[in-house]
Amino acid sequence: KRRANKKDFFGINVRELKEDEIEVFKDLMNKTSIRKGFIDRPLGYYKQMYSALSKDKILRYMVAEIDVDKCRKNAEAEISKISKRVEKLMEHEASNAGRIKEERVTINSNQKIIEQLDILEKEKGKIVPLSVVCLLTYGKEAIMLLAGNDEDYLQHFNTSNIIVAELIKLCKNEGYDYYNFYGITGNFDPKSESYGLYTYKKQYGGEVVELIGQFEYQINSLVKRLYDIMLKAYKLTKK
């Protein structure tokens, strides 16, 4: 909740992408697929999905984008405000040592944010998309089908949390009863590679629901073996 509440401070705007902006979604999905080691869909697939399902709001591509100027202005204002507090606390430095230390940590944190904003603006401009979600809605349920992030800046601006919090509020206001975070591996071992995905989805207060599952019927075992080999080779090249 604390992270999600940083939306206004960071100048984050969550909105629906238009048809001519689908490449924004594709770009962040591609970056995420390389980082996570899965095969991303081609741009044409996402465009076909949009064409078939967006008219009735069944499918929406959502983006969280940062306003660099707004965020910098807020961080600078925060530094100025805290610096004045520290100046006042320094009048009785010995008794306020703990608070002074905490305030200086916050100042340093905001200075790092400004440093990241300078890099971000130089590389990508003033309005920068950092997180995307493919949202599907049907009946009484909203499904977070796909999600992608710019990992280089995720640590500083928390857009993966902000976009989810905003979409949960959106879906609640639209009358949906459930927000489905979609799949997890079912491996709840804290040492497993997939545990982070589970904790990320669980932190919003959701419940784990086990569905019927799926099975594979191999029509051609040779083709299936070739596919598995090629998939493994593809993932190795991505690493």
Model region roles, listed by residue range:
Residues 1-154:
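A conserved beta-strand-loop-helix scaffold within acyl/acetyltransferase catalytic domains
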Residues 159, 183-239:
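C-terminal catalytic domain of photolyase/cryptochrome flavoproteins
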Residues 38-41, 87-90, 157-161, 168-171, ...:
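Glycine-rich loops and low-complexity Gly/Arg-rich segments
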Residues 17, 43, 181, 211-212:
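Residue-level detector of family-conserved "landmark" positions at structurally sensitive sites
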Residues 48-54, 98-101, 171-173, 180-182, ...:
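Low-complexity, flexible helical/coil segments
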Residues 128-130, 137-204:
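Acyl-donor binding region in acyl/amide transferases
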Residues 13, 177, 207:
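Residue-level detector of anion-binding/catalytic polar loops
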Residues 19-26, 30, 44-52, 161-172, ...:
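Short alpha-helical interface patches
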